[in-house]
Design a protein with these regions (language model features):
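Fe(II)/2-oxoglutarate oxygenase catalytic core
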Residues: 1-163
Length: 163
C-alpha cells in the first residue's frame, strides 16, 4: 500500500473531516494525528498489526487509543480489499462514505489484542481510505462509544464526509 499525510492548514475538507471525527469520538481535536490517505493496488496488502503506538514515538507522545478508518470507495464483495481482524474472524468490505471505528485499548487502559487487523489485497480495482488515530496519555474516556451503545466496532452511516 501507499500512504500520504493530509495537512490541515488551508484545506477546508481535511479540517471538516477532523472536526467530525473529534465530535463523534468525544476527544479534543488536538488528540487527533494528521489524516493519512492509504491506497491499495491489486496485490498490495497491509499485514495484520496493532495501531497502539509507534515504538519510535515513545515516551514522547501519548499512545493511540482509537482508530478511524474511513472508506473512500466501494469495492465489490468479491474483489478482496477487506479490512480483516484475524483474532475476531471478522472481515469488513470497504463501502464509500462509511468508517470503521475501534478502540485500540480496553476500558481499563490495557491493550486490546482483539483489534489486530490488516488490509487484504484487492483482486481488482484500487482501494482508497483515510486513517485517523487518536492519542491520549490516559484513558480520559472509558470508551469512544456513546452511552447505550455496545460492541467493539462502530460504523458512521450517512457519510462522515458529508455536510
Amino acid at each position: 500500500s501507499s500512504t500520504a499525510t493530509l495537512m490541515t492548514r488551508g484545506n477546508w475538507a481535511v479540517t471538516r473531516v477532523r472536526e467530525r471525527i473529534a465530535a463523534f469520538s468525544g476527544y479534543n481535536e488536538n488528540a487527533l494525528e494528521p489524516l493519512q490517505v492509504v491506497r491499495y493496488h491489486p496485490g498490495e496488502k497491509y499485514e495484520p498489526h496493532h495501531d497502539l503506538f509507534d515504538l519510535c514515538d515513545l515516551p514522547q507522545k501519548p499512545r493511540r487509543h482509537l482508530t478511524f478508518l474511513i472508506y473512500l470507495n466501494t469495492m465489490d464483495e468479491n474483489a478482496g480489499a477487506h479490512t480483516t481482524f484475524p483474532r475476531l474472524k471478522v472481515s469488513i468490505p470497504p463501502k464509500a462514505g462509511t468508517a470503521l471505528v475501534f478502540n485500540d485499548v480496553l476500558d481499563n487502559g490495557h491493550d486490546d489484542e482483539r483489534t489486530e487487523h490488516g488490509g487484504a489485497a484487492p483482486a481488482a480495482g484500487v482501494k482508497y481510505a483515510i486513517n485517523c488515530w487518536i492519542r491520549a496519555r490516559s484513558p480520559d474516556r472509558a470508551s469512544w462509544m456513546p452511552k447505550g451503545e455496545e460492541g467493539l466496532f462502530g460504523r458512521l452511516a450517512g457519510g462522515l464526509m458529508g455536510a
